[in-house]
Every structure is written in C-alpha cells, then in structure tokens.
C-alpha cells in the first residue's frame, strides 16, 4: 500500500502556497496525497487549478474570533461538525502524517489527527503565531517557523523561509504575453509591480486609479484581483490574476510595492528584489503584517510605508529613497541566510515524519 499524507490549510493564498510546493514532491515519491479544506475556500480553487493528483475532502468551517460575536455561537457548531468530519476522514484514510499550513480550516483536522495518534506537523510563516496555529501548536508534533520565535517553545524548529523563486532572470520561462506587455512600456522608465494579495489589493488599485500621473513617471504593473480592471495601455498593465507570469513579472520589475504577507516578502528577499512594504493595519488583520514589515525594515531588506500615509508625495519620497540606496538594500538581501530551498524542507519533513512514525 502507498504511504498517505494529509494536507490542510486555507483561507488565503498564503495558507496554501507551501502545500502546493510540497505536494508534487510527495506525489513524485509515490505518496497518496489528500487535502482537507473548505470546498468554497481558496484552497479548493488552488488545488483544482494545480491539476495535481490530490483527493480533496471538504469539511464544515467556522471562524475563530478573539472577540465576542453572535456569529461565534453558530461557528462553534460548524467547528464541532468539522472536527467530526475530520475524525471520520483521518480514521478512514489512516495517513502516515498530517501537514498543516494554518488558517481556521486547519484546526479540526489537526485536532483529529492528534486524537487518532497521527503525527502532526504545522508551519507558521509570520513573526507571531495566529490564533489557529496557537491552538494547533498544542496538538502538534513539530512546528516549523519562518521567523525565530521569541518564546521558548519546545516543539518549534526555526527553519527560515521556504520559497521557490528564480534568482536569475535568464532562468525564467519565455512568455509571449510578457513580450506583449513590454511593447507598451518605456525603457526610459522604472517598472513598478504592485502586489496586494488576496486581502489587500484594493488600496493599491484605488491609489493607481486616483493618480494617473504615476504612468508618466513609471511603468506600472498592477495585479488587481478584479477582472473588471484588466487593461493594457501605455505604461500600464492591470491584470486580475497571474500564475506562470508571476515570477517573470517580478523579475521584470525594478521595484515591487507589496503588502506585508510573509510569503511574498520572503520571495522578494530570495530574489534580492527592491521593495516597498505597505502592510495591512490592525483594522484589517491581527497586526502580523505590521510585525513582518518592521522586521524587514530593521534588517535593512526594505522600506515600509503605513497605509494611512500612502499619498502621492510620500510614495514618491519612498521611491526616491529606495532607488538612491538600491545597492545597499540589494547587498543586504543577497547576504541573507534566512532562505531555504523546497528540497531542503522536504527532506527535513520526510525525516521528521519517519522519526515520528518510529517513535509511535
């Protein structure tokens, strides 16, 4: 019988990306791969879009909140149902292990796997743990972290960032679509790429729409998340979503304007790509992006600009400062030791799974 592994994680693209890096490696080595998530969640969309040989198991999901809400009462029942469904799935499949990338949907599968005696491995990308992973940690065999955790947690392994990027632009796949974009861009202007992520693109979209004069100063690439904004015109390329074109666009950009999600930040670090961070504030998140942005700025990897301060004047000042000190930023990023290859993490995870199975 083939070995089986369960993956879980969802809610945002960041809670799926690492899973999509690891899954093909397990499949290549003959593992049977299953995924537990929300059928209406981005995890289901991404798994289907990937075309990977993965069996998806849908469960009920409820949001975990730190504050009082009447919705909590309904969600308690959803989480309980999700736990029962997860127990059934894990008991039926009898996997060798479960790997979780976090998000609210991941808690019931993690608890179920632990209750049924299966090794549980979880990953935390942010400077501080979210509520879902704080709960999941109690049931985990091992937690891998991108950042060093300030608390002394016995089950934590500080890994660094696992990212799959091309540092060399010559390694990028050729794209006729990219060549078409270049036809509308000026070689005399710097190229800026705006990436807002699944939760934060709106502010960038509005900023670019409100300031058409940006096109006179820069070539603009804007990943919008909104197909109604799609446009290719002089010095402007707006597209709702990219997959194969994502890294070529990153390589094409002289500077990236991004939110503070750790996955994107560490991709930029791995590419030594100049970037400005405009993190989501506490009104739109739990404050993790503010922590990530401050960490990157203190390390000398990037500059940050708070969302309320995102005016044309402040933006132009930030651009001028970043380009003036570009060599310093790039040298600091190139010297980093915070990046790990997918192969390194896969080998580590496989070894830890084997050790956990032997210890049972």
Curated annotation (Swiss-Prot):
Query: What's the top EC group for this one?
Result: transferase
User: Biological process GO terms, please?
Assistant: carbohydrate metabolic process; cell division; cell wall organization; lipid glycosylation; peptidoglycan biosynthetic process; regulation of cell shape
Note whether Membrane occurs among the keywords.
Answer: yes
Top-level taxon of the source organism: Bacteria
Compartments it resides in: Cell membrane
Query: What kind of membrane protein is this, topologically?
Result: Peripheral membrane protein
Protein's recorded name: UDP-N-acetylglucosamine--N-acetylmuramyl-(pentapeptide) pyrophosphoryl-undecaprenol N-acetylglucosamine transferase
User: What is this protein's gene name?
Assistant: murG
């Amino acid at each position: 019988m083939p070995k089986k592994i369960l993956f879980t994680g969802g809610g945002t693209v960041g809670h799926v990306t690492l899973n999509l890096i690891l899954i093909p490696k397990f499949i290549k080595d003959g593992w049977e791969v299953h995924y537990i998530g929300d059928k209406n969640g981005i995890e289901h969309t991404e798994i289907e879009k990937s075309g990977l040989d993965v069996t998806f198991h849908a469960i009920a999901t409820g949001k975990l909140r730190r504050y009082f809400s009447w919705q909590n009462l309904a969600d308690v029942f959803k989480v309980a149902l999700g736990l029962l469904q997860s127990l059934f799935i894990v008991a039926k499949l009898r996997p060798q292990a479960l790997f979780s990338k976090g998000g609210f949907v991941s808690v019931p599968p993690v608890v179920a796997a632990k209750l049924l005696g299966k090794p549980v491995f979880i990953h935390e990308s942010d400077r501080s743990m979210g509520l879902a992973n704080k709960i999941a940690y109690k049931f985990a065999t091992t937690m891998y972290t991108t950042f060093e955790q300030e608390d002394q947690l016995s089950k934590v392994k500080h890994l660094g960032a696992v990212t799959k990027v091309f540092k060399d632009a010559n390694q990028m796949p050729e794209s006729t679509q990219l060549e078409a974009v270049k036809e509308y861009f000026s070689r005399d202007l710097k190229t800026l790429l705006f990436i807002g992520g699944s939760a934060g693109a709106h502010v960038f979209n509005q900023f670019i729409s409100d300031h058409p004069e940006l096109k006179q100063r820069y070539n603009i690439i804007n990943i919008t998340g909104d197909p109604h904004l799609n446009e290719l015109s002089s010095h402007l390329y707006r597209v709702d979503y990219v997959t194969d074109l994502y890294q070529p666009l990153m390589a094409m950009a002289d500077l990236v304007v991004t939110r503070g999600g750790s996955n994107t930040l560490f991709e930029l670090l791995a590419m030594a790509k100049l970037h400005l961070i405009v993190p989501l504030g506490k009104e739109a998140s739990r404050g993790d992006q503010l922590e990530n942005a401050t960490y990157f700025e203190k390390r000398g990897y990037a500059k940050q600009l708070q969302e309320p301060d995102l005016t044309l004047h402040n933006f132009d000042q930030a651009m001028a400062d970043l380009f003036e000190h570009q060599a310093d930023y790039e040298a600091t990023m190139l010297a980093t030791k915070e990046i790990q290859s997918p192969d390194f993490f896969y080998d580590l995870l496989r070894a830890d799974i084997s050790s956990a199975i032997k210890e049972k």
